[in-house]
Amino acid sequence: GIDACNAALPNIHAAIGSDPIMNDKIRIGVISFSDTAQVLLPLSKMTDVVDFPGLVAKGGTNYGNAFTCLKNTIQTDMVDLQKSGAKMCRPIVFFISDGEPTDTNWKAAHAQVADKTWPFSPHIISFGLSGAQADTIREVATQVDKKGKSFAYLADDDASGAVLREIFNSLLSPILRDECLEGR
């Protein structure tokens, strides 16, 4: 699971980096979580990222800490982008987990991030690897397509890297086009 994600991230980076429109619009950051959550890659332009930090499976799966860290990071990053005069788009988060939450308060932290009254509330597209349950992954996703289908996905270990790349490429372009290029 995590190894496939680590293998997929450089390919996704290369795909975005080769598209001048996406490269201009996208900033990427990486937050890792287990028992705690930490920013591994601060929000950066794609052209400024040389190597992705490796994700490591360890400890528990504390979703609450992940969502709290995510909200704080988005808040800081979006304010910094506003100050720099950069065109702002609603953030898009790919939430990737290889397990079920080990904390009981994660839904409250998730609700704060997903709150549509928060001006920086992100689209959350969730991706579950081998240890994650479909119902939980669906509950994490906030983004839905025009037919109301949740952008929540599951993959087994063998297919996770390919599925992650496919999902990233098929979803990110339409969301960016709708929200950033057409000014939504």
Residue ranges and their predicted role:
Residues 67-119:
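Exposed acidic/Ser/Thr-rich ligand/metal-binding surfaces
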Residues 38, 48-89, 123-136, 160-166:
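Von Willebrand factor
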Residues 89-90, 120-123, 147-149:
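Short glycine-/polar-rich loops that comprise or flank the Walker A/P-loop
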Residues 3, 99-143:
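VWA/integrin I-like adhesion module and closely mimicked acidic/polar interface patches used
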Residues 27-32, 90-97, 125-128:
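Extended hydrophobic secondary-structure segments that form protein cores and membrane-embedded regions
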Residues 24-53, 134-143:
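Short beta-strand-loop
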Residues 50-51, 126-184:
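Von Willebrand factor A/integrin I-like adhesion domains
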